[in-house]
């Protein structure tokens, strides 16, 4: 700010209006004064400086570095190709899923290789360019100085007075030294230019050869990747087909096995059902009397009808067995010829002979089939059960016995004398040497029933079948409970006893579920004494006792009341 004059200062003193001082104005004034001082200090002592224009190096325009630094067009194959300087890059054809990532890595490597090639060429050319650029800058500076000197001479202003003769001598010596340096630099430039031309020719040859090799390598690599992908797709397709076929075959095999097991279980249940129905007949047949001479009065018609029915059943069974034997024989020439049907005239010996021949022909095949499927379907639980039953019957380990041996042992143990199975036998029958043998498979029959009951009880249909509601009968000795059908003995269950409930350490009580949430009702239907008194007192204005006393009058009072009116006597209750 310019200093105020005397008149302005006097005017400020005479002005009585209050002034508001802003602290920011003081700061602004101080800053402005400091800036003025700094500007003055910065320009002080530089009045004799000559104004010089901006140098070419300081121009903001782009600097032309040459053709070798200019960009060039590159094909996509050459861009994606791998660098020739990395020929030992391993690439696995099995890992085809990582081809895309590998291609991207190779593209990045190719770009880096190109950048390295350019950087190598630029490093060779930088010294020459920098030197040439520095020489050109010096020449331009010399030319600028000469032009400035000429302008100063033409203007003829009074700048020569500020320079002395000594300065002119120094400037002359500097000019001579600059001329010598310029000559040396020109010679160096010529040598460097020749070297640059040689390098450029070599670089051009390398540039023309590299794209060709890259294109060839890229084509070979694309062909390899396409072949690898095709092979991988083919392998995947075959693997998928193989896996699908394996899974389908396994599923079909499991389904077939399941259907076969269901069919076997159904057949076994049907046979067991038939055996259960025949149990009563077998028991009754074992209790039949010995063969006696028929009496003359016997009914011949009944015998003939029974004989005809038995022969019909026997013929049906024989036809069934012949059909099974023919199904086992594939050769038609070896099939058995069907005999004539049995009649009443056929002898018993011929019938027995035909049965024995059929049995001998089918025995080997039946035993082989039984052993085969017994080994296949034998599980851990079944094996344990069979082993226990075999050891009881044979006294040997169950693993060493086959199903046919077990069946033979059952048959041998079940064929006994008739006399031993009779409940009541005579003395003469026990000593008869020609006693007839009978068949009794009670042990085997009970084992079949046990297996059936355990299977049904373990299945989910145990509740619906009602097997869990069977009554358990107590045994005689109290060791356990016996099932009424299977005869199996249930192990005795140990009663749980609380050992801490003795000596008063724990209260003994039983909670009745029906009484747990029960509340006794209040009897509100009958009248109590208090309720009756309250009712009559509120109704008649008197207590019930007083009302009841009026009824207990003496005989004298009754005589006096006889003269009164009946209506008046009836209203006596309402008198005061």
Swiss-Prot record:
Residues 39-49 have a biased composition (Basic and acidic residues). The lineage of its organism: Eukaryota, Fungi, Dikarya, Ascomycota, Pezizomycotina. This is Protein bfr2. InterPro entries: AATF, AATF/Bfr2, AATF_C. GO terms for cellular component: nucleolus. The keyword Nucleus applies. Residues 1-227, 328-351, 414-433, 548-576 are annotated as: Disordered. Keywords: Nucleus. One of its GO terms (biological process) is maturation of SSU-rRNA from tricistronic rRNA transcript (SSU-rRNA, 5.8S rRNA, LSU-rRNA). It is found in: Nucleus, Nucleolus. The keyword Repressor does not apply. Transmembrane segments: none annotated. Its main location: nucleus. Residues 95-123, 142-206, 552-568 have a biased composition (Acidic residues). Disulfide bonds: none annotated. Belongs to the AATF family.
